[in-house]
């Protein structure tokens, strides 16, 4: 018999790994026993499951939709290292899922690790009562009254970009091709800087900004194969996100840069408030964060939470609106007749003035239709995944047939099961939106009774801003900024693709922080369009 003292460290590690793998296997078998045995696509890889296949697809939403048609509105998808996810494409099931978020369904280990690494322990990282507390503290900054006050900021940034473009067109009238995505990034960053933190990053003026430089590097770099493999395996081993891959190092640099800027802005605002060097608007985003830091109530936030909120706002303000604006210009360049129709609506009312917040909200129906059609077709976030914190019974609006051949109108979800909602798939579903669901048709939003039979309960029947307790807090802010910027762009310029006769190129997905559009053949996430002034 081998003495205990002779057992090597490697032997102990191997034994511990064996025990860990055994516990994972037992846990997986227990979860499967508590979960309805659903049908689903066959596995393509013992190592990656179907995760790599979906990650590399140009349109994962279309793949999910085809699986829903074949296997029913809830199905089982093979994932990394033999694990599985349940994907739900049923309106009633999705409503149930979102209503129980932060308590019944929580962030996956991968999501929490990624969010913590990038932002810190803020609103989108938190769960349960902590999430409820932080959301309540921030809500006043995104009220209608607050957004109404910020509308002028959105227009100011738009006109700064217009001045820069006019200068470009005057200096080089024979070459009016502009990479619009780069400029949408700048307008979004400057707007969130001024509106949220009373700080002008100056990216529209050509000033160097460390945070803009790091953001832009995600648009020019392509994840290596090794980075991709590590990210996929991190779904089972989240600690792999700490490995020094090129993408993880870039993420760490982004977090460091955002935190440094957030620290400076927060310290400056504290001094302004304490020394009365300036007026800190209590209901501005940074004003509310300062208030929450010193609060003696349940709404108090720690220094770490405050910096995390600022990181989230910086990144969300940069990424989501810039992506949506870029997609809007792409779609309107594809359909010049719809671009002209939008321009006619805007110029018929506003030639020398700008719309008020009220007019942006409800006085420009075609602008509203264009914006929501872009948000429907091109949600910045393609899907969400959560893990069941407890056993659950999920109702279905459409019955399905299980692997055993049984027809059921609800499914059991075992504790620990990963459940996903394919947002892009649901936004483009022919079952919900009709046979032309994949087409850009703003007019659908103007049809009498449109959406009355749509069972999706998200904003305007869309899942773009998700739903339930985690509904995007800044959706009103994002839509107002989107509308203000687009109204200035379309009143001022015409847009078309620069190829022969405006030929439409292939639009691909660039894997940035969030997926971005890019024109095929371009180096990085570039979308060059021919821009001409409206005479």
Swiss-Prot record:
The highest taxon in the source lineage is: Eukaryota
Broad enzyme group: oxidoreductase
Q: Pathway, per UniProt?
A: Secondary metabolite biosynthesis; terpenoid biosynthesis
Topology class, membrane: Multi-pass membrane protein
Q: Name one GO molecular function term.
A: monooxygenase activity
Q: Cross-referenced InterPro entries, in alphabetical order? A: Cyt_P450, Cyt_P450_E_grp-I, Cyt_P450_sf, Cytochrome_P450_monoxygenase
Where is heme bound in this sequence?
A: 472
Where does this one sit in the cell?
Membrane
Classification via Pfam families: p450
Q: Which cofactor does it need?
A: heme
The UniProt function text for this chain reads:
Cytochrome P450 monooxygenase; part of the gene cluster that mediates the biosynthesis of clavilactone A, a meroterpenoid that features a unique benzo-fused ten-membered carbocyclic ring unit with an alpha,beta-epoxy-gamma-lactone moiety, forming an intriguing 10/5/3 tricyclic nested skeleton. Cytochrome P450 monooxygenases claO, claP, claQ, claU, and claW are close orthologs, suggesting that a redundant function or pseudogenes are present in the cla cluster. These monoxygenases are not involved in clavilactone A biosynthesis nor its modification.
Family indicated by similarity: Belongs to the cytochrome P450 family.
Q: What is this protein called?
A: Cytochrome P450 monooxygenase claP
Q: Which organism is it from?
A: Ampulloclitocybe clavipes (Club foot)
Taxonomic lineage from the root: Eukaryota, Fungi, Dikarya, Basidiomycota, Agaricomycotina
User: Gene that codes for this?
Assistant: claP
């Amino acid at each position: 018999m081998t003495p205990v003292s002779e057992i090597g460290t490697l032997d102990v590690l191997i034994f511990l790994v064996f025990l860990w793998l055994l516990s994972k296997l037992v846990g997986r078998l227990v979860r499967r026993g508590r979960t309805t045995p659903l049908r689903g696509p066959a596995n393509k890889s013992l190592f990656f499951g179907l995760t790599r296949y979906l990650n590399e697809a140009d349109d994962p939403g279309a793949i999910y939709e085809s699986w829903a048609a074949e296997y029913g509105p809830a199905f089982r998808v093979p994932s990394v290292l033999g694990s599985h996810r349940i994907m739900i494409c049923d309106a009633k099931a999705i409503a149930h899922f979102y209503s129980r978020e932060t308590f019944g369904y929580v962030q996956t280990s991968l999501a929490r690790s990624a969010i913590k690494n990038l932002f810190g322990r803020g609103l989108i990282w938190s769960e349960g009562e902590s999430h409820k507390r932080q959301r309540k503290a921030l809500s006043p900054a995104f009220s209608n009254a607050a957004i109404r006050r910020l509308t002028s900021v959105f227009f100011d940034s738009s006109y700064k970009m217009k001045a820069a473009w006019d200068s470009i067109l005057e200096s080089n009238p024979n070459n009016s091709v502009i990479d619009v995505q780069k400029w949408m990034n700048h307008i979004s960053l400057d707007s969130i800087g001024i509106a949220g933190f009373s700080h002008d990053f100056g990216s529209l003026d050509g000033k160097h900004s460390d945070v803009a430089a790091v953001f832009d590097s995600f648009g020019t770099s392509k994840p290596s194969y090794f980075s991709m493999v590590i990210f996929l395996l991190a779904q089972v081993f989240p600690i792999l996100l700490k490995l020094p891959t090129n993408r993880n190092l870039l993420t760490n640099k982004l977090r460091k840069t955002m935190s440094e800027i957030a620290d400076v802005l927060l310290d400056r605002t504290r001094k302004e408030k304490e020394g009365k060097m300036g007026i800190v608007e209590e209901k501005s985003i940074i004003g509310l964060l300062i208030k929450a830091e010193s609060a003696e109530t349940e709404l108090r936030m720690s220094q770490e939470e405050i910096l995390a909120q600022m990181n989230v706002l910086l990144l969300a303000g940069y990424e989501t609106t810039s992506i949506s604006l870029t997609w809007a210009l792409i779609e309107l360049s594809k359909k010049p007749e719809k671009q002209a129709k939008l321009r006619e609506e805007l110029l018929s009312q506003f030639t020398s003035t700008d719309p008020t917040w009220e007019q942006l909200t409800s006085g420009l129906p075609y602008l509203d239709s264009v914006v929501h059609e872009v948000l429907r077709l091109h949600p910045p976030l393609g899907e969400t995944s959560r893990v069941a914190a407890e056993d659950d019974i999920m109702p279905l609006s459409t019955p399905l047939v299980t692997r055993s051949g049984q027809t059921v109108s609800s499914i059991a979800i075992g504790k620990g099961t990963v459940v996903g909602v394919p947002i892009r798939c649901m936004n483009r579903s022919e079952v919900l939106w009709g046979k032309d669901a994949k087409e850009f048709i703003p007019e659908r939003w103007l049809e009498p009774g449109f959406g009355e039979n749509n069972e999706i309960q998200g904003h305007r029947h869309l899942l773009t801003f998700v739903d339930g307790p985690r509904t995007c807090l800044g959706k009103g802010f994002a839509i107002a900024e989107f509308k203000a910027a687009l109204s200035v762009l379309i009143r001022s310029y015409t847009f078309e693709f620069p190829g022969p006769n405006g030929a439409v190129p292939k639009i691909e997905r660039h894997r940035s922080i969030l997926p971005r559009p890019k024109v095929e053949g371009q180096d990085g996430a570039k979308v060059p369009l021919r821009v001409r002034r409206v005479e």
